[in-house]
Amino acid sequence: MTATPAVIGLSAGNRLLSASFGPTDLMPDKVSLGVGGGGGGGGGGGGGDAMSFAPPAPATPKLTAVAAHRLKLSPHGRAQVMRALRHHSSAAAALAPPPPPPPPPTPSPASRAAHAHDLESSLEAIVLLQRSMLEKQWELPFDDDNHAMAIGLAEDDDDTSKATVVVARSSVSARQRRMSGRRRGRTKNGAAHFAVSPELIQSRNRIYLRGTVSKELLTHKQVVHLSHKIKDGIWLQQQRSKLKEKLGNEPSYKQLAHSLKISPPELRSRMHESFLAREMLTMSNLRLVISIAQKYDNLGVELADLIQGGLIGLLRGIEKFDASRGFRISTYVYWWIRQGVSRALAENSKTFRLPTYLHERLIAIRGAKYELEDQGIAPTIENIAGSLNISEKKVLNATEAVNKVLSLDQQAFPSLNGLPGETLHSYIEDQNVANDPWHGFEEWYLKEEVNKLLNSTLNERERDIIRLYHGIGKQCHTWEDISRQFGLSRERVRQVGLIAMEKLKHAARRKNLEALLEDY
């Protein structure tokens, strides 16, 4: 507990300092931390003009210090009096018990208004601080129209401590502001970043939204601008390929930028703008791809595959488009889209893939056939060849290449009872003789007859020589190999073999098996 001195009047303070105190007057039971009314307990003088110490709590004992005489003291004596007074005041404060906490004051209407004003000021300061921090972070001018914040304080009559803060949402997302701030930032060397053109990004956002095709068409001026961006990107890719051949590996952005004598940020910006320009032109002509692909629908290919082929042709046409010739891009890419759709139709419509030129020739032959039928002329090969101004051999080869493909697992006839019937595989002859069971039986029967003939006609040595030489059940051997196995000369083994063959011929004729030994 500390005592807070309060000086009430300058004259009273002077009188207190000019008074003298006796030892008995400064006892704790006579020191008061307040102002005594009138003279009070120690004698007259003083009255209400005296130096007082305001008591912090009513429970503190009242200790009074009263001047007995009015004497004139020197400055040194006054200092001693003040030190004695402070010493006894601190002792009295130490003996007093701690006071209870003061009750909360009842707010007045003036204090309520001041509190609301302070709260409003603090909220405004917080909002302004956040605003300045965001401006510093994004380094963008803070537009009051797009980034206005409205702060409203709703005061309730019953509860004045609640305040509602209403922040209006900006039309530009935080992510876009961060990206713009990064693009507008500066490099470590102090050079400015080369940011992507904001007009290009805004146009891209208007063209499509999450893959949805937009009905907004590009003007000729926009197409020319985007075409120049694409040409620039193609040129950069060509320079990158040349540098790759020169270095022997994939060059980095720094290496490519150094070879082109530009900065890496500028290189990245130009390549990104080329990518965005190609994407914008592709999305703006997507409806043309769909309309062309729908004309080739129901020809054996899914519409999605046709659209994919048309998109490949569209990308090729966008890269080849030259805006300086004055043609519209839709007129130019139409033929590229049509070529891509036709190629997709040729590659996916048949089970066995036909070359693209042959597929185009078949389309021309089909068209000539319909024209001849409309004119009442028989669509023969000669008439079709004359109509297309090609040879009859080319027409014949193209028509023979088109064969209907059927699966052997397909049912040969429709089932009447709902059960699976016989398939086409059951009605097709197998040309492989090894798969014929009768052929296997005949081969096994002939082997048995030959073995019986050998066992019944020849002795053991003759049978072994014949089996080794002709490879019956084993590998064929020469007369020299057989002679080494039997320890005989080559000529002797050959004579034994010839004699054995003559015996077999006579025995085969008797059993009507001479056809087996006809070659011998």
From Swiss-Prot:
UniProt entry tagged with the keyword Aminoacyl-tRNA synthetase: no
Short sequence motif named Polymerase core binding, residue ranges: 305-318
UniProt function note: Sigma factors are initiation factors that promote the attachment of plastid-encoded RNA polymerase (PEP) to specific initiation sites and are then released. Controls the transcription of the psaA and psaB genes in chloroplast, and thus maintains the abundance of the core protein complex PsaA-PsaB of photosystem I (PSI) in the thylakoid membrane. Maintains PSI activity, sufficient rate of electron transfer from PSII to PSI, and photochemical efficiency.
Tissues expressed in: Expressed in shoots. Expressed in the tips of fully elongated leaves. Expressed in leaf blades.
Composition skew (Gly residues), residue ranges: 37-49
InterPro entries (alphabetical): RNA_pol_sigma-70_dom, RNA_pol_sigma70, RNA_pol_sigma70_r2, RNA_pol_sigma70_r3, RNA_pol_sigma70_r4, RNA_pol_sigma_r2, RNA_pol_sigma_r3/r4-like, Sigma-70_RNA_pol_init_factors
Gene3D superfamilies: RNA Polymerase Primary Sigma Factor (1.10.601.10), Winged helix-like DNA-binding domain superfamily/Winged helix DNA-binding domain (1.10.10.10)
Keywords from the UniProt entry: Chloroplast, DNA-binding, Plastid, Sigma factor, Transcription, Transcription regulation, Transit peptide
DNA-binding region: 479-498
Location within or outside the cell: Plastid, Chloroplast
Originating organism: Oryza sativa subsp. japonica
Database matches in Pfam families: Sigma70_r2, Sigma70_r3, Sigma70_r4
Listed name of the protein: RNA polymerase sigma factor sigA
Any single Gene Ontology cellular-component annotation: chloroplast
Entry's Gene Ontology BP terms: cellular response to light stimulus; cellular response to redox state; DNA-templated transcription initiation; photosystem stoichiometry adjustment; regulation of DNA-templated transcription; regulation of RNA biosynthetic process
Expression induction or repression: Induced by light in dark-grown seedllings.
Chain positions covered by the region annotation Disordered: 37-57, 87-117, 171-190
Interval spanned by the transit peptide: 1-66
PANTHER family: RNA POLYMERASE SIGMA FACTOR RPO, RNA POLYMERASE SIGMA FACTOR SIGA
Statement: the UniProt record of this protein carries the keyword Plastid: yes
Ranges of Basic residues composition bias in the record: 175-187
